[in-house]
Amino acid sequence: MKKMMMMAVLAIVAMTASAQNTLRDNGTFTLQPKVGLGIGYLSGDWTMPAGVDRKSRVGVVAGVEGEYYVNEWFSAALGVNYAQQGWKFDGGGSKVTTKLDYLNLPITGNFYVAQGLALKTGVQFGFLLSAKEESTDVKDAFESLNVSIPIGISYEISNFILDARYNLSLTKANKNSTSDNKWRSDLIQITVGYKFEL
């Protein structure tokens, strides 16, 4: 997961060194449909059973983001996206996949440190749409709200946007958790989008 995130960051930096992009005027508003890959995994405090490995769940991320340019170096963005999150347990002769699907609402501040290159952070509210272990509905076992901090980088060229983010969950995912059994649903996402000026 960390290697994939690092590769995305290096790709963005490489594009920055070899391409130019037009600065947007103050007060410009853009709308950006986006789609990409999400890598969900389990973090937090818990005791892993002996012989059981934790793995990531790879899924789809798709949505739209509106962005308002306050000036040449700062903008504020509000988005909505569907994200397939979760994790897998492999061991003891069985494999169990926990599928958590969220409707996420990210609110970010974007700092343009170079032409087209933005660093971003903020807060994201995730609303649980469904939760399954294999084909069994387990939504009642998980919290309906997931609050996280998105930390990301993006690069724009000819209105196309490559965006890489790590969403660090602040709230526990599982209900009835104990002090040594608090699960968090984190997400790494890499998306490609296109900006339309309105």
Region spans (language model):
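Repeated loop/turn-to-beta-strand initiation elements of outer-membrane beta-barrel proteins
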Residues: F74-A76, L117-L119, N159-A164
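Residues that define the transmembrane beta-barrel architecture of outer-membrane proteins
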Residues: G27-L31, R54-V60, K99-L103, E143-I149, ...
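Transmembrane beta-barrel strands of outer-membrane/channel proteins
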Residues: P33-I39, V80-Y82, T121-F127, Y155, ...
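Short glycine/proline- and aromatic-enriched beta-strand/turn motifs that initiate or cap beta-hairpins
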Residues: Q20-E67, N167-S169, K195
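Outer-membrane beta-barrel translocator domains and adjoining extracellular loop/strand segments
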Residues: S43-A50, K88-K95, A131-V138, N174-S179
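Membrane-embedded beta-strands of outer-membrane beta-barrel proteins
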Residues: A62-V64, L105-I107, L119, I151-I153, ...
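Predominantly the C-terminal beta-signal and adjacent terminal strand-loop region
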Residues: Q85-K88, V138-L198
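Outer-membrane beta-barrel channels and translocator barrels
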Residues: N26, N71, A114, I157-F160, ...
